[in-house]
Amino acid sequence: MEATAEAAPCVDTLGNGVITPVHNGQAGSPHVRVNWKVEGTNISITYGRPFLKGRIVGDTVEPLEDSVWRLGADEATTFSTSGDLMVGTTHVPAGTYTLWTLTSDATTRLIINAETGQWGTAYDQFRDVGRTTMTVGILATPANQLTLSIENSELRFEWGAMVASVPIMVH
């Protein structure tokens, strides 16, 4: 279900993106589309924003060790760009993709995948455009709700005490 005309966009304080509500997910996670303009290139991410609700990232909620995660709730998170990008070490041509993460051996990788339109657990590694290592840190104030943003030339996500980022630039 698409957002109604009454759903006014608001400014995302993490990266100056514009957030538009899309729908409420099956388990109550709101779904949003966030749009940014980076050096003339339009970038949007549509994803479910789950709440922790007392759960612990890596223990009782994704991302779990050695498990591919859809980087959101419900449907697979989509990432669209109107121009070619470099996301970490991965060249991403203009188009629409899905975003996933894989954490193993204390390394978190962002996966950019060419398959779109699937439910969030239907991941096909043979459709990967690329995988790139993310820089991981600890937030001073944990994020109770998953947030994806683009700021300071980085694509980042905040979830629980974790913040992970990867450089992003127009190519």
Residue ranges, per PLM feature:
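Mid-length scaffold segments of soluble, non-membrane domains
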Residues: S67-Q118
